[in-house]
Design a protein with these regions (language model features):
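Nucleotidyltransferase catalytic core that binds NTPs
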Residues: 1-139
Length: 139
């Protein structure tokens, strides 16, 4: 029996790499049903101020094809509490590179108050979509 019934994680999943796969695998190891929110192009433009290399519809298909993923939903907002109200997960998974940030401290308190655990998973060192993009651009 896994620790959580429904888990949730989110990401852009642009230029899909081993770090993305590791987060999805580690999350699935802890929950029976893993829901993954894939950030829409509009959301990425709003908070990262750049357009993903891979279009949203293709990123959705890539994530849906991963065996650790049970369900994929569009992430149209950074509001994790609103996502909980819609999806009713009992754990939310994030890379530990977010741990301690003001935004995540606040949302962790709100989610804990309704019985949701925020689980930080070890970030895969040395790999990121930003670094891959820089290499492709010759930086």
């Amino acid at each position: 029996m896994k620790k959580y019934k429904i888990g949730y994680t989110t990401g852009v999943f642009d230029l899909f790499h081993i770090g993305h796969l590791n987060i999805l695998r580690r999350a699935k190891e802890q929950c029976e049903h893993l829901i993954v929110g894939v950030s829409t192009d509009e959301l990425v433009k709003d908070y990262k101020h750049k357009t993903p290399v891979i279009p949203f519809e293709e990123r959705i298909q890539i994530v849906e094809a991963i065996r650790y993923v049970d369900e994929v939903v569009p992430q149209t907002s950074m509001d994790k509490f609103a996502a909980w109200e819609r999806l009713h997960f009992d754990a939310i998974f994030h890379g530990d590179d977010w741990k301690g940030s003001a935004m995540y401290n606040e949302i962790e308190q709100k989610l804990n108050a309704v019985g949701v655990d925020m689980v930080f998973l070890k970030h895969t060192q040395g790999t990121s979509s930003t670094e891959i993009s820089k290499k492709l651009q010759g930086d």
